[in-house]
Amino acid sequence: MRVIFSISLLFTLLFSQVRVGEMKSITSSLDVQTLIGSGDDIILATRGGLAFYNINSGEYQVFTKDDGLSDTDLNTLLKGPKGYIWVGSDAGVQIWDINQKKLVDWFELDIEKVAEFVSYDDVVYGAIEQDGIWGIMEFIHTNDRIYYRDFYGRNDIGEIDDIVKFGDQLILSTDRGLLAGNPHETHPLYWTNPFPEIQTSIIALDQRNDELAIVTPDAIYSVKLGGNPVSLVTNEIEFNTIHTIAVAGPQDYTAVSDSVIYHIGNDKFEKQFSDAGYHFSSIFHYSSNILLGTSLGFALFDGTTFNHIAWGEPTVNSPDIIYLGQDKSMILASQKGISILKEQNWINASTVNYTLGLSTQIDLDYLNLNMGSRVSEIVENSDGSIYLGMQKSSSGGILLLDIKASIEIRDVFISPRLLQDKSGQYPLFTVNAMTFDKNGNLWVLSTNQEGKPLSVHYEDYSRNFSFEESGNLLSESMTAITKDNFNRVWVGAKSQLVMYKYTGDVYSPTDEIWVSEEINTGAFNSSVLCLNVSLNNRLWILTPAGLIYKDLQVSETNPVNQTGPKMTNSEIYPYFSNVAFDESSRIRFDPRGNIWITSQNGVHIVSENGEYWPDVNGLNESNSSILSDDVKDVAFDRDEGLAYIATNKGVSVIKIPFAEKKKTYNSVNIFPSPFRIPSSKPMTVDGLKDNSSIKIMTLSGEVLRTIPNSEVQGYQAYWDGRDQSGELVGTGVYLVAIYDNNGASSFEKMAVIRQ
């Protein structure tokens, strides 16, 4: 089958005509949680959105927040009444119109988890956790609308794994065993076990055509409607590994564990397929095939042949870090591996070894190492070499990567450059932070050598700094590092900053200076979470109390000129003092020097003179279409004015008014063309120099509208199709005169169609 929908091509088009403030999503739909077959379509609930795959054409489409979804990290789905697709996630219940390709409704309702849906007489029930209570939630259709009716919770249930309709009853698989009842007759509080002979825990459950399959630790049962459970197979140790079962026919079942497909019948328990790499999540009988959701796409299995289907997306969907390289390659990294967007294609390296029948649509290599619990930092040397720091890795502290053609490991920094800790036979290496100085030396904060948290590296040279060498200013609590514009190294600890300055060769210096500086937040907890220095040589310090700065000066013994921000009474008053920051929060600078701070409550932006963008709340799920409030990192395309915001659910890309200053008008782009009016969205003139103004003119030179530079947002100006008096202009071709305060100018033509 051929995928004719090009995700790479779509990515290149996403941001070609985007206005400041507009946001697009980059997600990965490879991690499939649930899937069903419907006609020629396979419908998938994934960690990156709602996906549709046409079995005949190979066309693949993914719907995200860009298309109206409220959440993209999806758990389960159902094709319910009127053909609507019911989608469950930890953020609520969404209903999708498959024909109009749009969201019909969304119910948040303090939902914390959706386990499964079932349809019962045109009523949809969900096994749902709400405010810490598990129960079933009821939705009804009336007058072509969907309504939430009620939630029936049970305090005696710790979890519901599944819900199925069997005859006129709904059966729940819970941590208390099976519970069943008719929702039209009995309140769920009074539901009881429909099969008292089954008193053990329930592993998996499914029903089809009046046949019920039940998996317990001791047996797999078949139940005919109106009958009693009949054990098909018993006492197989692998029962406990099964998590999903699907009924194909009478006493004919298929079950999956994390890596094995089983065929089950009367006195039959056969292993049909096994591969530890795929991580099966769900199963669905579709025509003569079995559909299998996996952590890397999905598969069709006919009992013999395993046909894997995946597409060109990143395998890293929840990155710890994002980095845009010198060649504009975008790097995503996490404990699962590395994904790189290079020349419109994703290349991937995974710590999971996928061995059998991998789809040729995905570029994936095996990364034979342990990447620990978190990727702490990515830095790039002047030659394009990529250094990736890891925390709690058994393989090493730093990966040196070559990504020119593929993802190749050139080196792994371990002992003696980053010495082992004291964890015994299986030491873990932890690098908390890294930075390059102006001489190309790589500075590293690591916990791997007792009494020597700071080290420096250049090719085969290395040096570890001890507590004693620093005058006992260094400590094991050092977690943040940066360099200033005077090539001095700054490290942060729980209660202080330490500056180090060397003269000559750092590996055998002629002089060294160590200076301690108080943090001065005025708060009880002033530990340093992150450090970064702006182009203006302002040292920005993130603490649990908020964001402060220190203006640096050339003096080696007194390197700080002043600390801020300050209130009118001269006391320090940190920015974002009401935001919860932690050790995963980062400080990044956009092309205009604005400070972006990541958190689990969105990303917060402030300029060096204290102005917030877009306001004091920053960007979060309540005021934007960002994929998640849990923001891990930010990177910037300096030329295009794009901020790539890495979240735990993918990357949100927003057009910001903070691109590099344009030197000419050669990159001016006017869109849409033609401009059809009236329109809810204005015509946009993109690629302007600073302090530009616009005049809309007829071909004969009559000025219809002037847009002064005070109304220009960064490098974009907007026109609503109206003249100076507020009237819509007529159909025709118009001139756009662009000019700045220094006399530079440009003329463009654009067409208007008045409808």
Predicted regions and their residues:
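Bacterial Sec-dependent N-terminal signal peptides
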Residues: 1-22, 743
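Carboxylate-rich, polar loop motifs that coordinate divalent cations or form catalytic acidic clusters
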Residues: 3, 17-667, 703, 735-737
